[in-house]
């Protein structure tokens, strides 16, 4: 039996291929994993329609050759993009209120996605299954309205899935206004301090809209026939086994690693990648470069950026630093790097870019460690590439991921506890942690552990691996005609 990449779905006698519609919340960290899943599904001979907002569509069109509604071949199937107008301009001040925005998006999204489903039904291309990612649980309502099976792609760890599940379920105690420092004891998860749970679940969080949007998915959990998780069994074995006994959780990751096997120019990136950073890495010695990137949403204080920069200089290590303009709705200034760092870069000691192909960078032999915000996509990519990390989490699931990287996976060192700590890590500590992760006995141990997880990730997506098997079963279920069964075996 072949691997995920080799399997081709044998369609039934119907002249129309199975049609799967993927609906994504806007944002690089949401679009990328769902699009990877979409490309994999399409490569098996299915038709995939990928849907997100017009605002994000505009960014994708600028960076990629995307034409709305145009079928793009992917393996034995095809994929196309559809974008719906959410009616608010990018600079609309109402976007800053996430609770207000998410309610508006639900109202518009239900209407527009329903129109799309109806349009394809009338065009004799009925949607067979709807799949969404977190923050837009209303996709399940659309599926229910049209009597279409639905599934979810969870783009955080299974440990975080368990945290939200048990918070919603009420079976585990979480911090409250009266007990804000309560430790959280989830089944099959290490005890988490109050600042180590997904921060949206803490009563002090300003982001109540995020909390409610994610919990909305858990209120609709019984409507989904499957919850796909971008993780792999051996990485979170105990909590995956436990959660699988409660709901239809199936690991299919690392998705980015499997997606590499699909030959396609379809991309959801919003910036054009450059090969200049890869060419520069080619000129550096093995395991000599610190790669620094804090994702597309995490925003560190300017003072902290300056201390990290001076810490890098103090360490004497070469660096590749991605500095991206912050999202418009954050209403904050773009980070400014110290002149000394820019001068060091000009002399060839480092490189500063606004975008880079992170997957390729992390797999480059010159990279010694990754200074990261610990978002799940970056966490999976670092583990699957065998790269140690310096953890600089900010909020959301990042603080929980940092605990796992440091204490469970043992591939990282800590550089702060998150935004709630309200502490600026000094340059001396930054330099110390960078050297700890790149030079000496501790660095060797971190690298050894990271390479172990890289091998485990490869085994998961290889023929017969856990993720390979789960994805096969999922696609076969789509082809057989999904029924709304609630049993955990699909």
UniProtKB/Swiss-Prot annotation:
Record keywords:
Detoxification, Glycosyltransferase, Transferase
Which residues of this protein are catalytic? 30 (proton acceptor)
Q: Where does an anthocyanidin bind?
A: 30, 396
**What tissues has this protein been observed in?**
Expressed in roots, flowers and siliques.
Give one Pfam hit by family name. Answer: UDPGT
Question: Which positions are annotated as binding UDP-alpha-D-glucose?
Answer: 358, 373, 376-378, 381, 397-398
- Any Gene Ontology biological process: response to UV-B
User: What is the reaction catalyzed?
Assistant: (E)-4-coumarate + UDP-alpha-D-glucose = 4-O-(beta-D-glucosyl)-trans-4-coumarate + UDP + H(+); (E)-ferulate + UDP-alpha-D-glucose = 1-O-[(E)-feruloyl]-beta-D-glucose + UDP; (E)-caffeate + UDP-alpha-D-glucose = 1-O-[(E)-caffeoyl]-beta-D-glucose + UDP; (E)-sinapate + UDP-alpha-D-glucose = 1-O-(trans-sinapoyl)-beta-D-glucose + UDP
Going by the record, the broad EC class of this enzyme is transferase
Show the InterPro entries listed in the entry. UDP_glucos_trans, UDP_glycos_trans_CS
Q: Which domain of life is it from?
A: Eukaryota
What EC designation does it have?
2.4.1.120, 2.4.1.177
Cysteine disulfide links: none
Q: Which GO terms describe its molecular function?
A: cinnamate beta-D-glucosyltransferase activity; hydroxycinnamate 4-beta-glucosyltransferase activity; sinapate 1-glucosyltransferase activity; UDP-glucosyltransferase activity
UniProt xrefs under PANTHER family: GLUCOSYL/GLUCURONOSYL TRANSFERASES (PTHR11926), UDP-GLYCOSYLTRANSFERASE 84A1 (PTHR11926:SF986)
Give the family per the record.
Answer: Belongs to the UDP-glycosyltransferase family.
State what this protein does: UDP-glucosyltransferase that forms glucose esters with phenylpropanoids. Glucosylates 4-coumarate, ferulate, caffeate, sinapate and cinnamate. Can glucosylate the phytotoxic xenobiotic compound 2,4,5-trichlorophenol (TCP).
Name this protein carries in UniProt: UDP-glycosyltransferase 84A1
């Amino acid at each position: 039996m072949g691997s995920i990449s080799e399997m081709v779905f044998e369609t039934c006698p119907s002249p129309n291929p199975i049609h799967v519609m993927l609906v994504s919340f806007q944002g690089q960290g949401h679009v990328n994993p769902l699009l990877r899943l979409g490309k994999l599904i399409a490569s098996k001979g299915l038709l995939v329609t990928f849907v997100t907002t017009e605002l994000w569509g505009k960014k994708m069109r600028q960076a990629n050759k995307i034409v709305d509604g145009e079928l793009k071949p992917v393996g034995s199937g095809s994929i196309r993009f559809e974008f719906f107008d959410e009616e608010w301009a990018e600079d609309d001040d109402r976007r800053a209120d996430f609770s207000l925005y998410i309610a508006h998006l639900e109202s518009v999204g239900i209407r527009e996605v329903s129109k799309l489903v109806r349009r394809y039904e009338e065009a004799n291309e009925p949607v067979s299954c709807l799949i969404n990612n977190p923050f837009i649980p209303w996709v399940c309502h659309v599926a229910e309205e049209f009597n279409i099976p639905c599934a979810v792609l969870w783009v955080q760890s299974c440990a975080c899935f368990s945290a939200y599940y048990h918070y919603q379920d009420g079976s585990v105690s979480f911090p409250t206004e009266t007990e804000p420092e309560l430790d959280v004891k989830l089944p099959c998860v290490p005890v988490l301090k109050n600042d180590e749970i997904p921060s949206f679940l803490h009563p002090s969080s300003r982001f109540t809209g995020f909390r409610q949007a994610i919990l909305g998915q858990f209120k609709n959990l019984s409507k989904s026939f499957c919850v796909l998780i971008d993780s792999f069994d051996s990485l979170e074995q105990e909590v995956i086994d436990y959660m699988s006994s409660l709901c239809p959780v199936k690991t299919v990751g690392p998705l980015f690693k499997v997606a590499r096997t699909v030959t396609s120019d379809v991309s959801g990136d919003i910036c054009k990648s450059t090969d200049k950073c890869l060419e520069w890495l080619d000129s550096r010695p093995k395991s000599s470069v610190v790669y620094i990137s804090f994702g597309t949403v995490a925003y560190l204080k300017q003072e902290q950026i300056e201390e990290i920069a001076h810490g890098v200089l103090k360490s004497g290590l070469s660096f590749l630093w991605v500095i991206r303009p912050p999202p418009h709705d954050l209403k904050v200034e773009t980070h400014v790097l110290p002149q000394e760092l820019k001068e060091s870069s000009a002399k060839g000691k480092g490189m500063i870019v606004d975008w880079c192909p992170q997957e390729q960078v992390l797999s480059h032999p010159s990279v010694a460690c990754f200074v990261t915000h610990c978002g799940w996509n970056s966490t999976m990519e670092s583990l699957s590439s065998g790269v140690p990390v310096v953890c600089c989490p900010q909020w959301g699931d990042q603080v929980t991921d940092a605990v796992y990287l440091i204490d469970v996976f043992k591939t990282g060192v800590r550089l702060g506890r998150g935004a709630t700590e309200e502490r600026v890590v000094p340059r001396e500590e930054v330099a110390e942690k960078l050297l700890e992760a790149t030079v000496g006995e501790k660095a060797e141990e971190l690298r050894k552990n990271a390479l172990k997880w890289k091998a485990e990730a490869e085994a998961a997506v290889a023929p017969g691996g856990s993720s390979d098997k789960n994805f096969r079963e999922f696609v076969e279920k789509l082809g057989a005609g999904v029924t709304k069964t609630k049993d955990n075996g699909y």
